[in-house]
Amino acid sequence: DSLDPAMNTDTDADSIFHALYENLMRESDDGSGEVMLTNGMAKEYTEETNYDGTVTYRFTLRSTARWSDGEKVTADDFVYAWQRLADPATNSPNHSLMSVVAGYDEVRETGNKAKLQVSAKDESTFVVTLSAPCAYFIEGICTAVATMPLRRDLTEDGAGFDMPNVVSNGAYHVSAWSKSSKLTAVRNEEYYEARLVGPDELGFVFASGSEEAWKLYEAGDIDYIAHLPDSVIAELSQDKNWKPTAVYATACVLYNHESDLFSNEHIREAFDLAIDRAAAAAAGGAENTPATGLVPSGIPDSGETDDDFRTTGGVLRSIDEEDVNARQAEAREELSYAGYYSTSMFPPIELLYVTGTENDAVAAALQNMWSTTLGVTVMLRGVTQAEYNARMEAKNYELALQKITALYDDAMGFLDRWCSESEQNLINYENGTYDVLIGVAAASENLVARTAFLHDAEMMLFDDMAPSPVYFDGTAHLLRDTLRGVCTDGFGNSYFTGVRVNTD
């Protein structure tokens, strides 16, 4: 609905933003179909640790960086965009990306966006001071959609995000846009690497769902599907060599820790133990895998090894069938510890979720597990996204089903949301020790120590039965075999600048 990078929350739309805009750093194809980090608008940068523990980055912008109307991309475009993102008046859902920048808390408290420690030394030098070292700043913050540069002259009146006024600084710019059906982007001839960009034109078709997209693909109307329908995935999954593409998202059962029932740890544990994660993942689709922790596969660890955070953290919830059966027997005991010696004593409860997605099947599977194992009555409450958001923000729920995602590829993005004062803590979880662990990790300059603190924090969430991770999200995409060069990252973003005709 909008081409305002600061306001985007649709992960599917991220691929469009990455085609139209470019940040200080960018992701690109490494030549083998994998994503690699490379310089974007910034041709180089320096990092300096200051006497007070803050860290200053100086980015030198490319002299050839241009907007699609020929205007030069300047440091002030980044200053404006980042201050606007942090400004409470903007009401961006992505403002927490700026929380690592010095002055962010003052901006949020006072509304004075000038307090954010970003500046333009000159038109080609963008300076950022962080309140502490941040392991994911370059790869996470400096590539994010929400921190893309913006033109002050085109943004302040809002007209710059509607046709025909849309101006962008990426490899493509918008040539036509029908909000309900299709966006067409053409090569930006002002782009500094315009001659290396693949297709002359990209057409993003907004299908009503994966089944409609598949019909368009079969008819030859589109060349790439970002999300294959379940029927096609089920067929592909019969091939033992086929693997889905993991994305950085974990479907979780959320407990309201201030509700009469789920303030009791034994009840939370009973509901967690009763979950058969393999069955729940399968109910959601063949592309999903059972969750063995909260932080999903693919998120980097300390960097000392090639192992990711999940591999290093190990299996926090076994998905072995024998272990699941034993845990389900234990679940009934946990209810008795909470004083519910008979299932007839346990009141009916409601599971809140967004309907019209895989959630419908997953919610039904969970309902059956809790009924079969615990003998409790769980009523399903499928609602619209808007109603779901309103009820979660008001903490008006007992149980909820939600996919937990992060704005950057770091374990912190999945863990700091559960801190007592976090705006994202929708479960009313409070643990002072947990808050300290996250705080120490955030301030640590030693990556190995930082990661160790984060592993301890994840384990504490499981010890406290804070949320219950159910499955890791996955996806499956398909490019027509006459083409090559689309690469995807862990967020499910697709990059198209390297697409070429397949000559093999």
Residue ranges and their predicted role:
Residues 1-50, 167:
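N-terminal lobe/hinge region of extracytoplasmic solute-binding protein
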